[in-house]
Amino acid sequence: INFKDALFDSIKQCNNKCPFCFIDQQPNGKRKSLYVKDDDYRLSFLYGSYLTLTNLNKDDWNRISTQKLSPLFISIHATDPKTREQLLKNKKASQILDQIEWLEQNSIQIHAQIVVCPEINDGKILEKSIYDLAKFHKKSFKTVLSTAIVPVGLTKFRPENDGLIAISKEYARKIIQQVEKIQTSLQKSI
């Protein structure tokens, strides 16, 4: 049996307004499917698409738990509630640590991702986020399997006045040094 789509109903659309969203940074006039902003846990489980957990309803959480849909790929960006809320422009974004705790209690593993945006979620906020996520790796059940740190990608098609700063080579080196130092520290304690 072949199915037209992997999902039998429509894709769950993203209701966040992240200033760094790659969908919003594409040129106009391309095929419609390139402009679909999914935030669908089913696509995360099936294909490794990243989701934010802000768009899930009670039934979605229940299904993730009941069907043990694991691992999921989660866009974290910051564990600091105010910073994550600022980045996703969504009040529900501040609940990320409670949501990861719920995933842990339900034996769901994740791969985490942090998109580093200069002067927003770097420095001490980045360090706190990495260490917060590492706590979920140190336990007997490793909820957080990996944490990817990626630089914000900006195109010439992005909306004006998005408040983002492009990453220079020097800044990238500084972030790499910071993350490698944290990584070395965690490798000794995990």
PLM region spans:
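Conserved Radical SAM active-site core
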Residues: I1-K142, G153-K174, Q178-I182
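Positively charged, polyanion-binding regions of nucleic-acid-associated proteins
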Residues: V150
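Short helix-terminating capping/connector loops at secondary-structure junctions
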Residues: K139-V144, K188-I190
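Membrane-inserting hydrophobic helices used for pore formation or membrane fusion
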Residues: I176, S185, S189-I190
